[in-house]
UniProtKB/Swiss-Prot annotation:
Gene3D superfamilies: 3.30.590.20. Keywords: ATP-binding, Ligase, Nucleotide-binding. Pfam families: GCS2. This is Putative glutamate--cysteine ligase 2. It catalyses: L-cysteine + L-glutamate + ATP = gamma-L-glutamyl-L-cysteine + ADP + phosphate + H(+). Belongs to the glutamate--cysteine ligase type 2 family. YbdK subfamily. GO terms for biological process: modified amino acid biosynthetic process. It comes from the Bacteria. It comes from Clavibacter michiganensis subsp. michiganensis (strain NCPPB 382). Its EC number is 6.3.2.2. The keyword Ligase applies. ATP-dependent carboxylate-amine ligase which exhibits weak glutamate--cysteine ligase activity. GO terms for molecular function: ATP binding; glutamate-cysteine ligase activity.
Length: 383
């Protein structure tokens, strides 16, 4: 890959396969179900520092994000999230605020939402992206998994792109936008990729390719820092991880645990394969693009491209086989129960399917969908 500038980017030391999770949560008014811009008020109860785990704000004032510490076990990271959310709920309850999570809100309108003030990063993003950036009324889950050497980052990233449609379909939770059913399982996926540095990563092979890309993009003014590359899967050099960001926001701790376990097992297996001198699978970029669109459009009904040869399968059938293959790895990592929760999603339906059922049962009314999402989150906390 040619480039005019190569920027050296140090990759932090992180014990391999350690996992950390970020969960974006929407604040909604208990009476109306509308989004409520109360995150700044809630966050005053959580003094900011750089310690983990922590609670923080996001792009919009209707959003609170909880972040786990890195752990070797998925279950311990999820325990962090549960403790943090319990604290957030204790602050939000007296304000008449509930928490929910989905890729999008079923009916609130984006022009009614406020951008978090006094944040230079958000102001710069908004100044550059304008109308599209202003519409980013979306929520997601980010899963970090540690890798022990920067040279593994791009091969593992490319291999994870083979699995991206599974991640997208299993987490899909955004069938509605501004009160309308979109016909997409994940409308968030299509919204987020409108930002110029979001969506699928470019076709890179080595860490040097990545450094040259960052150098070139900095040189021509696309970004000021590599953290502004908001790809669906990206290296996170500061933490020594690969960060899978394609997931729609999901409403239960159990689903988050299952998705995190799936990524952890895959990265662990891929890293071990590289240690054995094996080449990891990858697919043509247009196959990856097509898979993302199919999963965003059809969710668990998507027929996905499985490999570079163009073999296809229904995503649910393909995922069942993958879970069985990863079972020994999950057992070794202590996340077998969490991984098998993926099969529960396949059997009972992803969040978008459950939301659509609730809307249908209520003659198309969407307020009950918000109630359903709030109740799913609370039930996972035992409330």
């Amino acid at each position: 890959m040619d480039g005019r500038t190569r920027m050296q980017i140090d990759f932090a030391h992180q014990p391999p396969s350690r996992v950390g999770i970020e969960w974006e949560l929407a604040c909604v008014d208990r009476g109306s179900g509308e989004l409520a811009g109360v995150a700044p008020e809630i966050l005053r109860s959580f003094p900011h520092d750089d310690a983990h785990p922590h609670v923080t704000g996001e792009f919009l004032t209707n959003t609170v994000e909880v972040v786990s510490a890195p752990h070797s076990r998925v279950g311990h990271a999820v325990d962090d999230l549960a403790r943090l959310i319990e604290r957030v709920v204790d602050v939000a309850d007296p304000l008449g605020i509930d928490l929910m999570c989905a890729g999008t809100h079923p009916f609130s309108a984006w022009p009614d939402q406020d951008v978090t003030p006094d944040n230079e990063r958000y102001a710069t993003l908004l100044d550059r992206t304008r109308w599209w950036g202003r519409q980013m009324m979306i929520w997601g889950v980010h899963v970090h998994v540690g890798i022990d050497d920067a040279s593994k980052a791009l091969p593992i990233l490319n291999a994870l792109l083979v699995h991206l449609p599974r991640f997208q379909a299993l987490s899909a939770s955004s069938p509605f936008w501004s009160g309308q059913e979109t016909g997409y399982a994940s409308n968030r996926a299509l919204m987020f990729q409108q930002l110029p540095t979001a969506g699928l990563p470019p076709d890179l092979t080595t860490w040097a390719d990545y450094e040259r890309l960052v150098g070139d993009m900095t040189h021509v003014g696309v970004i000021d820092h590599h953290s502004e590359l908001r790809w669906d899967i990206r290296p996170a050099p500061k933490w020594g991880t690969l960060e899978t960001r394609v997931f729609d926001g999901v409403s239960t701790l159990g689903e988050i645990a299952s998705l995190a376990a799936l990524v952890q097992c895959l990265v662990h297996d891929m890293s071990a394969a590289l240690d054995r001198g094996e080449e990891l699978p990858r697919m043509q970029p247009w196959f990856v693009r097509e898979n993302k669109w199919r999963a965003a459009r059809y969710g668990m009904d998507a027929i996905i491209i499985q490999d570079a040869a163009g073999d296809e399968a229904l995503v649910g059938d393909d995922t069942r086989a993958l879970v069985e293959r990863l079972s020994p790895t999950a057992d070794a990592l202590g996340c077998e129960a969490e991984l098998r929760g993926i099969l529960d999603i396949v059997d009972r339906g992803a969040s978008y399917q459950r939301q659509l059922r609730v809307a249908e049962e209520n003659d198309g009314a969407l307020a009950p969908v918000v109630t359903h999402l709030v109740e799913e989150l609370r039930s996972g906390l035992g409330r």
